[in-house]
Structure formats: structure tokens, C-alpha cells
């Protein structure tokens, strides 16, 4: 089958004009691209779709086509993308989009650009129904509210909810049938979706399950949902690990000894650690874990121990810089799990103070920070009391 999509981006957007500063909703910026681009890329990624015709209002056609060409040059979706001028009514815009389809097109999906969150599963459900022989297919959702028929301010009937459905796009059609339905319709017959024309033509229309997230941007309050849903955050995890040797007068290292700090908290009476900075092994591991959440490299790359500027630098500075860089890349930290591995000193007397200090450095509450301490049962260099290790695991969300 040759399945094409007609993407309608020709609406006037009058209900949103004031809230959007006069910008038509199909041209609202979402992640640096106009709203219609998000829907276009969803169809372009579908293996069922052979091409897309984008319908713009006549007054927008030239500029929008030039803008679209620029987006296609930068990130071509890999299938033909054509444009057409819209008409006075929605059905006129659809008709013009149908006229722009290539001769090989046999099936068509009609979609409103004001539904930018159409997903691959919904497109596939409509396409599969067409491939199975259905000639008119629409996605629907159950109506959960009680629906009343009214005349002015008076209720005239309560409609049976189980017989009602909320309709979405994309709506799929056999192209020949849809063209016949358009040709059959009276000039004064106005419709709000294409399935209505097919119904009026006397042909059956079938349904597939819609998608709740496939909302239509219509009212000013929808803009908040648009901003939140435009770039849904993805879960991320960062891992950090660090080691420091203890100072030993019999075996001095290349780096100077520093009083022990863990999580920015001084550990009095503990062995000194060898370090270029202040040697806070826990904050070093945590800094690496934060950087790991955003593919930001590691602490040694950002703060090399060969740089004298970092001599005895407080590790909280490293963590603060890493947090700024990570937040600039869209990171929100939700939980931190920390482990200190050492034979000495004993961590439990200091654990709560360390935990609270780390939470403060991260801007989290203490329930979002877990701290554990363990030994290696006398094994390895920590078991021999020659050093200390720390492991950090950071969980969060990142907006693309």
C-alpha cells in the first residue's frame, strides 16, 4: 500500500491568539521547532507512511515552506515532504491536501498539527486497520464525563455515555472513498472531521483505540501542558568511584596530606589522606556520578590535579560546578545512594552529619540521600588501613 499523510497546519488559532502573543498555534516553538514539526517527525518515523503533505494557510505558505525547507536540510526525515495551500474551511484545506498527493497514493491519514503528541503506536493502529481492508478508520477514546444535551441554559436530555466516544486524529481512509465523499458533499455542508463526510456519504466508519496523550492544543491553558510534554524527561543514572591513600610517614606520597573530610564534614582524629585538593573521597565520587548523569566526563577532566589552582581546593566547589553544568543540561536529581568503604575510621558516629551536609550541598531533603558504610573484612588496601574508597549512585531525570 502507498499510505500518505495530510498534515493540517492551516488553522487560524483564534482561541489561542492572545495567550500566544498572536502566534498561530501550529507555529508555536517547541524545542526550537514549530509545533507542526513534532507531528511531522512522528509520521516520518512510521514505517507505514510513504510521504507527508503539510497544508499551510495561503498567507503563510511561502514563508512556512521556506522555513520547512531549512528544517529539512538540517534534519531530513527521509521521505518526501510536500506543501499545499489551505482553504477557507478545514474541509477545504483537506481537499487541497488531497489534490497535492502523488498519483501512487492509495491510502491517506488526515492529522491536525494541533495534536503534536501523536505516537507511533496510534499511527500503526490506524495504518494496520487500513491494511486489513477497513476504508475509514478513526481513533477514539471513551467518554468519562456525563454528557448533557442542552438548549440554552436548559438540559433537554442526558446522552448514554456508553454510546459516545471522543474522536481524535489521525483519521485513515481509502483515498478513492474519501475523494468520493468530498465530491458528494454539498457546498454548504460544514464538518469538523473527515469521518463525518464519509458518514454523510453513507459509508461505514470503524474505530481503533486512541491515545490519551494525543491531546489537541486549543485553549490557553493547554500551553502549560505543551511546555511540560514537549520534551518529556528521561530517567538517568550516574555512577562515581574514588580512592585516596592514607598518609604514611614511612612511605610519603607525591601529594600532600590533608585532614579527612567526608561529604564536606571534617572527621576529627581520622587518618590524613593524600590529595591535591582537600581529598574528600565521598564528594569526589559524588561529583563523578553527577557528571555521569549528563555524559559530562569525570572530575579529573574538569579539575585536573596538575592545575595548581586546585591545590587544597574544597571538594564542595567541584560538586557545585558539576551541578551547575548538569542542571544546564536539564538534570533534576531525585535520589543519591552513597557508600564509604574503610576499615578506619568508624563512620557511624558521623553518618547523619555527613548525610545532612550532602543533602544541603545538593539542595535535596535528607530522605533523598542514603549513606552506607562498610569494611572489606580486613582485605585489600582498605582492610590494611592504607586508604579509603567511596561509591556514589545518582538517580534523576533529564530533559533532552
Swiss-Prot record:
Cofactor: a divalent metal cation
Site (Transition state stabilizer): 15, 25, 276, 375
Residues holding 4-CDP-2-C-methyl-D-erythritol 2-phosphate: 242-244, 276-277, 298-300, 303-307, 374-377, 381
Pathway: Isoprenoid biosynthesis; isopentenyl diphosphate biosynthesis via DXP pathway; isopentenyl diphosphate from 1-deoxy-D-xylulose 5-phosphate: step 2/6; Isoprenoid biosynthesis; isopentenyl diphosphate biosynthesis via DXP pathway; isopentenyl diphosphate from 1-deoxy-D-xylulose 5-phosphate: step 4/6
Site, as annotated: Positions MEP for the nucleophilic attack: 161, 216
Positions of the UniProt region annotated as 2-C-methyl-D-erythritol 2,4-cyclodiphosphate synthase: 236-400
PROSITE patterns the record matches: ISPD, ISPF
Region (2-C-methyl-D-erythritol 4-phosphate cytidylyltransferase): 1-235
Known catalytic reactions: 2-C-methyl-D-erythritol 4-phosphate + CTP + H(+) = 4-CDP-2-C-methyl-D-erythritol + diphosphate; 4-CDP-2-C-methyl-D-erythritol 2-phosphate = 2-C-methyl-D-erythritol 2,4-cyclic diphosphate + CMP
Residues reported in the UniProt entry to bind a divalent metal cation: 242, 244, 284
GO molecular function: 2-C-methyl-D-erythritol 2,4-cyclodiphosphate synthase activity; 2-C-methyl-D-erythritol 4-phosphate cytidylyltransferase activity; metal ion binding
BP-aspect Gene Ontology terms: isopentenyl diphosphate biosynthetic process, methylerythritol 4-phosphate pathway; terpenoid biosynthetic process
Annotated keywords: Isoprene biosynthesis, Lyase, Metal-binding, Multifunctional enzyme, Nucleotidyltransferase, Transferase
CDD domains per UniProt: CDP-ME_synthetase, MECDP_synthase
Record-listed E.C. numbers: 2.7.7.60, 4.6.1.12
Function in brief: Bifunctional enzyme that catalyzes the formation of 4-diphosphocytidyl-2-C-methyl-D-erythritol from CTP and 2-C-methyl-D-erythritol 4-phosphate (MEP) (IspD), and catalyzes the conversion of 4-diphosphocytidyl-2-C-methyl-D-erythritol 2-phosphate (CDP-ME2P) to 2-C-methyl-D-erythritol 2,4-cyclodiphosphate (ME-CPP) with a corresponding release of cytidine 5-monophosphate (CMP) (IspF).
Family assignment from sequence similarity: In the N-terminal section; belongs to the IspD/TarI cytidylyltransferase family. IspD subfamily. In the C-terminal section; belongs to the IspF family.
NCBIfam families xrefs: ispD, ispF
Protein name according to UniProt: Bifunctional enzyme IspD/IspF
High-level lineage: Bacteria, Pseudomonadati, Thermodesulfobacteriota, Desulfovibrionia, Desulfovibrionales
Originating gene: ispDF
Amino acid at each position: 500500500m502507498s499510505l500518505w499523510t495530510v498534515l493540517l497546519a492551516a488553522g487560524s488559532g483564534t482561541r489561542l491568539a492572545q495567550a500566544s502573543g498572536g502566534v498561530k498555534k501550529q507555529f508555536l516553538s517547541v524545542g526550537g521547532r514549530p509545533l507542526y514539526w513534532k507531528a511531522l517527525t512522528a509520521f516520518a518515523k512510521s514505517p507505514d507512511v510513504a510521504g507527508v503533505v503539510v497544508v499551510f494557510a495561503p498567507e503563510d505558505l511561502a514563508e512556512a515552506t521556506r522555513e520547512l525547507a531549512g528544517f529539512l536540510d538540517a534534519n531530513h526525515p527521509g521521505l518526501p515532504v510536500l506543501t499545499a495551500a489551505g482553504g477557507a474551511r478545514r474541509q477545504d484545506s483537506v481537499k487541497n491536501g488531497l489534490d497535492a498527493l502523488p498519483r501512487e497514493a492509495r491510502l491517506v491519514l488526515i492529522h491536525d498539527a494541533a495534536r503534536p503528541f501523536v505516537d507511533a503506536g496510534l499511527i500503526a493502529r490506524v495504518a494496520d486497520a487500513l491494511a486489513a481492508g477497513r476504508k475509514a478508520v478513526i481513533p477514539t477514546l471513551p467518554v468519562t464525563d456525563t454528557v448533557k444535551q442542552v438548549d440554552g441554559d436548559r438540559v433537554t436530555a442526558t446522552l448514554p455515555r456508553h454510546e459516545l466516544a471522543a474522536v481524535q486524529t489521525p483519521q485513515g481512509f481509502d483515498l478513492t472513498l474519501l475523494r468520493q465523499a468530498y465530491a458528494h458533499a454539498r457546498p454548504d455542508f460544514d464538518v469538523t472531521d473527515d469521518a463525518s463526510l464519509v458518514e454523510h456519504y453513507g459509508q461505514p466508519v470503524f474505530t481503533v483505540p486512541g491515545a490519551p496523550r494525543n491531546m489537541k492544543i486549543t485553549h490557553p491553558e493547554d500551553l502549560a501542558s505543551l511546555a511540560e510534554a514537549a520534551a518529556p524527561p528521561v530517567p538517568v543514572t550516574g555512577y562515581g568511584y574514588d580512592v585516596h591513600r592514607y598518609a604514611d610517614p614511612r612511605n610519603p606520597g607525591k601529594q600532600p596530606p590533608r585532614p579527612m573530610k567526608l561529604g564536606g564534614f571534617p572527621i576529627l582524629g581520622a587518618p590524613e589522606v593524600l590529595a591535591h585538593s582537600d581529598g574528600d573521597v565521598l564528594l569526589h565520587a559524588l561529583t563523578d556520578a553527577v557528571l555521569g548523569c549528563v555524559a559530562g566526563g569525570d572530575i579529573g577532566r574538569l579539575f585536573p590535579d596538575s592545575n595548581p589552582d586546585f591545590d587544597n581546593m574544597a571538594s564542595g566547589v567541584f560538586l557545585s560546578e558539576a551541578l551547575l553544568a548538569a542542571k544546564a543540561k536539564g538534570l533534576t536529581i531525585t535520589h543519591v545512594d552513597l557508600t564509604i568503604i574503610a576499615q578506619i575510621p568508624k563512620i557511624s558516629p558521623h553518618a547523619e552529619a555527613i548525610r545532612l551536609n550532602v543533602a544541603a550541598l545538593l539542595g535535596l531533603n535528607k530522605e533523598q540521600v542514603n549513606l552506607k558504610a562498610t569494611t572489606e573484612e580486613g582485605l585489600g588496601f582498605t582492610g590494611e588501613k592504607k586508604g579509603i574508597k567511596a561509591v556514589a549512585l545518582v538517580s534523576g531525570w533529564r530533559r533532552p
